Amino acid sequence: MARRRLGLALVAALALLSPGAIAAEGVVAPSFWDPGRKPEKPDLAAIKQIRFLTEDDFPPFDFALPDGSIAGFNVDLARAICEELEFSSCTIQRRRWDLIVPALEDGSGDAAIASLKITDAAREKLDFTAPYYTTPGRFAVRKDSVLAAATPAALEERTIAVQADSAHEAFLKTFFPKSKLATFPTAQAARTALKEGRAHALFGDAIALSFWLNGQDAGDCCMFRDGPFADPGYFGDGVGIAVKKSNIALRRALDYALARVAQKGVYAELYLKYFPIGPY
């Protein structure tokens, strides 16, 4: 997923919202784990510590607070994992984005919970847990739109704003061949085109769109239309926690903890806290 910088003021406000209040608005947390499968606790004897690595400028996943500490969905999830594994030696350290993978490789960090996408290229260097979120594509339209659906038939001969040379553009070319594509150099420019009425619909990253729709930049102009498109051939296999290739014990421990955190409802609480307009 492209690294989009969303408004910190919005994220800080989200952090103060209660999960119950958000859930009441109908947002449903996704599930990436089989609720009927009881995870088997692995042997944790070989794991002496977990040094989580993340960044601090990719809200709502990780961001710096005024007091210098870090917060966000990734940060809270790391804390929940530490609590589930009952590790006293468990830290969350910030790194610049381009230094996170090198830190795993040189052993100065143990696990990267920094929105790293699971790709074939990444798997050559790192091991990943099962995905803890995905990055599907989704359509948005203006609130005064007459479009009742976001289907190839409904969008035939309609203009769709999309970022140029992106997976989203490639997807549209394949599955919406009769639509008119208005391409833009950035996702922000494509969003502005929809807001200003220069396109009938917008197609882009669902997570980024969810925060744009809820933020000041959108000006309450727009809304999602229909559900997400999660074709892994275009949008990847999701995002996981990365560990050094040889650290099998830690990967198994993290997978176990993620499944347990999900079963206990903690994952859903965190999701509802940070995603007031569900991207899925």
Where does each model-flagged region fall?
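Bacterial N-terminal signal peptides
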Residues: 9-18
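Periplasmic-binding protein-like
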Residues: 56, 133-141, 210, 214-258, ...
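Bilobed "Venus flytrap"/periplasmic-binding protein-like clamshell domains
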Residues: 56-59, 68-84, 117, 138-191, ...
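Alpha-to-beta junction loops
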Residues: 87-89, 105-114, 195-208, 217-219
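Acidic, polar ligand-binding/catalytic clefts
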Residues: 75, 79, 83, 90-154, ...
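Bacterial N-terminal signal peptides that target proteins for export
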Residues: 1-9
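Extracytoplasmic small-molecule ligand-binding "clamshell" domains
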Residues: 24-115, 124
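Ligand-binding clefts/hinges and TM-proximal coupling segments of bilobed small-molecule sensing domains
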Residues: 24-35, 42, 167-184, 224-225, ...
